[in-house]
UniProtKB/Swiss-Prot annotation:
Gene Ontology molecular function: any one: transmembrane transporter activity
Subcellular location: Cell inner membrane
Statement: the UniProt record of this protein carries the keyword Lipoprotein: no
TM region(s), chain numbering: 11-31, 43-63, 90-110, 151-171, 195-215, 223-243, 274-294, 295-315, 328-348, 447-467
Family named by the database record: Belongs to the SLC13A/DASS transporter (TC 2.A.47) family. DIT1 subfamily.
Source organism per UniProt: Haemophilus influenzae (strain ATCC 51907 / DSM 11121 / KW20 / Rd)
Keywords: Cell inner membrane, Cell membrane, Membrane, Transmembrane, Transmembrane helix, Transport
Source lineage: Bacteria, Pseudomonadati, Pseudomonadota, Gammaproteobacteria, Pasteurellales
Pfam family, one: Na_sulph_symp
Principal place of residence: membrane
GO cellular component: plasma membrane
InterPro entries recorded: CitT-rel, SLC13A/DASS
The protein's name: Uncharacterized transporter HI_0020
Length: 479
């Protein structure tokens, strides 16, 4: 039975109240103990969703400020202003500004134009349409940090139109083409979302949360290099796996007619589309060569956002209407600030010391790594939000890995990539899932079977080929 909003709010208020009534564990400061209660309540709030993510985080920030100001000895460890530190993080603004590019692809119609050209060139069979989806998502992913916007706003409407044109009906003929293509849309986006740092907002969030624990940082291009070999291999296999589990009844497609109709509706390519194409290339160039250009990825994104406005590709009003960008700015900056409070108050250091006395993986760092990454995928059945999973579990898994001697670089990369592909296990593992599943072509059984094959298959690929590749990059000094 679904919980009422009032019941959810009572649960959220009870959690920090418990940390007020109970004494702090040995070795943990009182302020860290009380802030932990707020943090746990925040994570539970992201799962229960009595309100949207921004409201939950703003409430958590407000409560944290009150606690810091009224807890004895708190100001020796943290200051009231520290709870807002997440909003001055470069990654927070990188994600926010990258949303402008994402919106521009939808507003100008460039995303649809690219898709129809791909369909016309390669989509002569349903299997090839699966690969068209893959290539399109991969092409758009560096500039769309909301995989929900990318999948739901650009790719899903096009594939849904194709499915309808092929005569596949959710009730009468779902297996004709719709079941395969809709499942493929979701499984593809869960892999493209970790190939690029800017392909999904929780990527940067995971990095930010792990940095104080593992001391691991990376750049846009190093992230891509690390993800490229295992990620592209997994991506290539996904349309085949979906095709094998849910083979479409229709094999051949009149792709030329579909592409022609779609392009005719769009009309000739506009100046805005041409300008956006150039800016997209500039953004990729800037992110790839940011070190050589002596500018960071955030500045590149801000430059491109400003140029999009100056060239009238989008207007400031368009940016104001981008709810996803503003929502992400508020909750993302908030969760980084909350995690920073725990780090400054000594919670993660205490957690590491506590776990090191409990866990016995001395001399078996690789075994610890395998166990942690397997758990990181397995627990995704419990989470309906990638952001909630990252905030709740990534710091814990990072801490456990650190104290058990798991190799730092391998652990960090394994966790950030598993964050995305791990969400494949269910139809609610990320925002694009309910969109594709909600079209009505799929059943839960085949979806979950496919998701398990892809998620745990990706895990095996990353534990073998992926780690061999990362070790090679490390030996060359490229990671």
């Amino acid at each position: 039975m679904a919980l009422s909003k009032n019941t959810k709010l009572v649960i959220l208020m009870a959690i920090p109240l418990i940390t007020f009534l109970l004494p702090a564990p040995d070795g943990l400061s009182l302020i860290a103990w009380r802030l932990l209660g707020v943090y746990i309540a925040t994570i539970v709030g992201l799962v229960l969703k009595p309100y949207g993510e921004p409201v939950i985080l703003l409430a958590a920030i407000a409560v944290s400020g009150v606690i810091i100001g009224n807890t004895e000895g708190a100001k020796e460890l943290v200051k009231v202003g520290n709870m807002l530190d997440g909003y001055k993080s470069g990654t927070t603004w990188l994600i926010f500004t990258a949303f402008t590019l994402s919106s521009a692809f939808v507003i100008t119609g460039l995303g649809k134009r690219i898709a129809y050209h791909m369909i016309g060139a390669m989509g002569s069979t349903t299997l090839r349409l699966g690969y068209v989806t893959m290539f399109l998502d991969l092409l758009l992913s560096p500039a769309t940090p909301s995989n929900t916007a990318r999948s739901g706003g650009i790719i899903f409407p096009i594939i849904n139109s194709v499915v309808v044109a092929l005569g596949s009906d959710p009730e009468k003929s779902p297996k004709k083409a719709g079941r395969y293509l809709m499942m493929n849309v979701y499984m593809v986006v869960k892999t493209t979302s970790y190939i690029f740092l800017t392909a999904m907002a929780p990527n940067a969030l995971a990095l930010s949360l792990m940095a104080p624990i593992l001391g691991f940082e990376t750049t846009w291009i190093k992230w891509f290099l690390a993800a490229s070999v295992p990620g592209l291999l997994c991506l290539f296999l996904i349309p085949l796996i979906c095709y094998w589990v849910s083979p479409p009844e229709l094999k051949k497609v009149d792709n030329k007619a579909i592409a022609k109709k779609g392009l005719e509706e769009l009309g000739p390519m506009s100046f805005r589309e041409k300008a956006l194409s150039v800016l997209f290339v500039i953004a990729l160039f800037g992110w790839i060569f940011s070190n050589s250009l002596h500018i960071n990825a955030t500045i590149v994104a801000i430059i491109v956002m400003v140029l999009c406005i100056v060239l009238s590709i989008v207007t400031w009003d368009d940016i104001l209407k981008s709810k996803g960008a503003w929502n992400t700015l508020v909750w993302y900056g908030g969760i980084i600030g909350m995690s920073g409070l725990l780090e400054k108050s000594g919670f993660f250091k205490w957690l590491a010391n506590t776990l090191s006395t409990i866990l016995q993986f001395e001399g078996h760092g690789m075994m610890a790594l395998i166990v942690i990454l397997t758990l990181s995928v397995s627990v995704r059945y419990l989470f309906a939000s990638g952001g909630a999973y990252v905030a709740a579990m990534v710091p814990v898994f990072a801490t456990v890995g650190h104290v058990t001697g798991a190799p730092t670089e391998l652990l960090a990369l394994g966790l950030v990539f598993a964050n995305s592909y791990g969400g494949s296990v269910t139809h609610y593992g990320g925002g694009p899932g309910p969109i594709a599943f909600g079209a009505g072509y799929n059943d839960i059984k085949s979806w979950w079977i496919t998701g398990a094959i892809i998620a745990f298959g990706s895990l095996i690929i990353h534990l073998t080929i992926g780690m061999a590749w990362w070790k090679l990059l490390m030996s060359l000094g490229w990671l």
